Design a protein with these regions (language model features):
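Hydrophobic helical membrane-anchoring modules
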Residues: 11-15, 196-329
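Residue-level signature of catalytic and energy-coupling elements of molecular machines
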Residues: 20, 38, 96, 111, ...
């Protein structure tokens, strides 16, 4: 009986497949370096494991597609998905997870800012059975603009105060996950996705692997300050209604303040019968107050619009992405 169980266990080990998902957008210069590093990881694996590399071309305008096709032609372990246009990194990660067949699935950037050298350690941690996810976290932001680093840290503090889930400061999308974790993530089929929040929301036992910030091996970042700002807004709107509550609290506060101000002048004018020319001298302050309240109202309407807009987008039920070409399994 023990021998039979041992044989079954060995068969499960042989069947282990590791899927490495790489979203790509204009990464023709980086892909050869990344592919070489991934091949080194595959060669150095002494366990009974198979690997598949899944490249998701997110509507690149350079020769990224040609590079991927060439890799796939020379390596049966290379799979790919080409989008019909640029749908964004979130859609690319979702598409890669849908295509992945592995028992362990990893997501990593094509620019090698996610060190492939961490993958063997991640595999070892998952093999231990103590964790379901092994995720990478930057402990420094060396090489990153200071203003960008400052806003990033403020964002993590803000969203963690507002949300019920905690998103680690410096957390990357780079992580190795068991199949059941990926299945849980895929069940969250939102159109406007914020994966860092989804990773935290689904839960599971997570180990963090810390590393120093690594600069891009080639090319330029696709994330401008404005794109990061919009991404931050998407994250906040996707995982908390705190902004709406803040707008409600501000409404109560200014309503009370306005009532108190009105009561003050009522008592002064009617009860105490103190008449002055404040109505002339107070005109600038009144105008500033009206402009301030008007701006506050517009801001609150904008917040409401963000949430209603999300409902509208989700209600249309459009696909998260559309493919133009896909490798055969």
């Amino acid at each position: 009986m023990k021998t039979a169980l041992r044989c079954c266990h060995d068969l499960r080990r042989i069947a282990v497949l590791i899927s490495l998902i790489v979203p790509c957008y204009n990464e023709e210069a980086s892909l050869p370096f990344l592919y070489e590093a991934l091949c080194d990881v595959r060669k150095s694996d002494t366990g009974d494991r198979n690997y598949e590399f899944i490249f998701v071309n997110d509507g690149s305008r350079d020769k990224t597609a040609d590079v991927i096709r060439e890799l796939a032609a020379n390596d049966k372990g290379v799979k790919y998905i080409f989008f019909s246009r640029n749908f964004g990194k979130e859609a690319a990660m979702y598409a890669g997870m849908e295509k992945a067949k592995g028992d362990y699935i990893a997501i990593m950037d094509a620019d090698m800012q996610d060190p492939p050298s961490l993958i063997p350690e991640m595999i070892k941690d998952l093999d231990s059975g103590e964790y379901d996810i092994v995720a990478a976290r930057r402990v420094t932001r060396k090489g990153e603009p200071k203003i960008r680093s400052w806003f990033a840290r403020r964002f993590y503090k803000l969203i963690n105060r507002m949300c019920d889930v905690e998103i680690a400061d410096g957390a990357r999308d780079f992580r190795l996950m068991k199949r059941e974790v990926v299945d849980a993530i895929l069940s969250v089929n939102e159109r406007q996705r914020f994966s860092k929040g989804i990773f935290a929301w689904v839960g599971f036992r997570t180990k963090w692997v810390e590393h120093e910030n690594v600069e891009r091996v080639a090319g330029e970042t696709k994330w401008s300050f404005w794109k990061l700002f919009k991404y931050a807004i998407d994250g906040i709107v996707a995982f908390t209604i705190a902004p709406l509550r803040i707008a409600t609290y501000m409404g109560f506060f200014f309503s009370f303040a306005g009532f108190a101000y009105m009561l003050y002048y009522f008592i002064k004018a009617i009860v105490l019968q103190i008449w002055t020319d404040d109505y002339v001298r107070g005109y600038p302050s009144l105008l500033c107050f009206i402009l301030f309240i008007g701006g506050l109202i517009l801001m609150c309407l904008g917040l409401i619009g963000e949430y209603i807009g999300r409902i509208y987008i989700e209600s249309k039920g459009r696909p998260i992405y559309i493919t133009s070409e896909e490798s055969k399994d």
